[in-house]
Amino acid sequence: MNDEGDLLQENTRDEGNETEASRMSKLRRTRKKVTKQHIFSTEVGEMDVSNSKERIRSQMVCHTLGNMSKPVVGPGSADSHLPQDDKDSENQTTVIKPSPLKTSASAPCSEFNTNSNHADNTWEDTQIPTTPHLSSRMKHIKQEMAKNHLQFVRFEATDLHGVSRSKSIPAHFFQEKVIHGVCMPRGYLELIPNPKDDEVDHIRATCFNSDIVLMPELSTFRVLPWAERTARVICDTFTVTGEPLLTSPRYIAKRQLSQLQDSGFSLLSAFIYDFCIFAVPEIINSKTISFPASTLLNNHDQPFIQELVDGLYHTGANVESFSSSTRPGQMEICFLPEFGISSADNAFTLRTGVKEVARKYNYIASFFIETGFCNSGILSHSLWDVDGKKNMFCSSSGIEELTITGKKWLAGLLKHSAALSCLMAPAVSCRKRYSKESKDLKESVPTTWGYNDNSCAFNIKCHGEKGTRIENKLGSATANPYLVLAATVAAGLDGLQSSDGVLASPGDSTDLYPSKPSEIPLKLEDALVALEEDQCLRQALGETFIRYFVAMKKYDLENEETDAERNKFLEYFI
């Protein structure tokens, strides 16, 4: 690993005069340069970072500002004792790289063997310099808290399943916790399958008993209309030494978006979710016949739908449309596209919000798939220039066709579809839909794509006011939205960097050439193998995360039968 603080990303792109060809050429260059300066850049200026305490202070200030397009990433990791074949550090494209405060190199896991006093001391001694941007944001938040007579603020973070894990803080302690963070046991988010499991020996079992720190991104502060006198703020997770948690799905997504930005692009995306509304003890509208988008079903319980949509709007998650879906009690909700991490934040907000609103009406809202049909989780996305002014998928010819950039992006998605399916359909039950049209017993099915074809895994839409976009339909609603976003960007970027794999024109074969046709494994076990063997995704998402994810899923498979009773209750949480 390089010396602390010695790595900074240099942004050398000329945003105004890039052609598509120059973008392709640029993507093949080395995207990391080494400098010898200890400079910490923020939107309010630069400061010299000269010691460990200053570096932690700098990291916390930039993070608190809530700059979602430029995530805070440290050069080290929570697992710095690992052999340095871990690609996390080698492939980070970051704006800020404050050096972590390290413990003795002779104690590989010593940074985890901490108690709450250690955690408090680490952050307590750090005084946050006040910036105009931070002061303005805090002033606005204080006004909101007073206006709404808030009593509590939830500090929320996502676990591997996309489930919100949080601690509620009395409102009068909010500013203090913004500065010092909120401690939470690491095992709450990483969900260790078994403390004695040798497959996760890259993270020692004792590490799961240590604290991590939830640091709020203030731009995500929202009053929750469905929770009495309560607000929430989405947090990023750090070790007590100020290093990002490498298994954090939101951190992984922000890192991939940073890679995309450094390559001269931005992502406009939105999630489309199916979820089920249950009454007690049966499904609402539980008829054997299905009427998708039926007006009567759309308005079956108007107060519930109105409160949900209005509540999501006030949390910043703009619902574009909703309707009944293909199964009894199943609803579809579509979000308005947004740039950056916001689309995943909106999906994360929905996953908790819909359950809280449903509970007020004595319903259960669930994304979990157990009854034999699928709740889908589609990521509709398009690639834009870094300024968000030009759709890089949209052909100027006026015909239904992707640009070369779009074709390369799609080629990357197809190339990595087997590994992508592992992250996007992470349970046995949600992989059944891959073979629903096939009567033959197969190990895999071809990955399909097409124009305006909703039966394909990747559906290209060129119509409508949104412009050309690709719907990634591999996902189920149980997948973590941050991982879906991160993996899609990683695969697409690899397609842009590749010199082959250009798609045929619409009139020719829909296969890739010269690459071999891609396949989606039907069994989760085979998908896990594909993920382990996919060097691109291993490098992009990080060795630490991949090894942990695979270990946890293997544990789930081994205990699938014994967990059947436990799974009956997952609909309350997933």
Curated annotation (Swiss-Prot):
PROSITE patterns: GS_BETA_GRASP (PS51986), GS_CATALYTIC (PS51987)
Biased composition annotated in UniProt, kind: Basic and acidic residues: 11-23
Region (Disordered): 1-36, 66-131
Residue stretches of biased makeup (Polar residues): 91-131
InterPro entries: Gln_synt_N (IPR008147), Gln_synt_N_sf (IPR036651), Gln_synth/guanido_kin_cat_dom (IPR014746), Gln_synth_cat_dom (IPR008146)
GO MF term list: catalytic activity
Residue ranges annotated for the GS catalytic domain, each copy included: 249-574
Domain GS beta-grasp: 148-242
GO cellular component, one term: membrane
Biased composition (Basic residues): 25-36
Similarity annotation: Belongs to the glutamine synthetase family.
Subunit text: Dodecamer. Interacts with BFSP2 and VIM.
Its job: May act as a component of the cytoskeleton or as a chaperone for the reorganization of intermediate filament proteins during terminal differentiation in the lens. Does not seem to have enzymatic activity.
Name of the molecule in the record: Lengsin
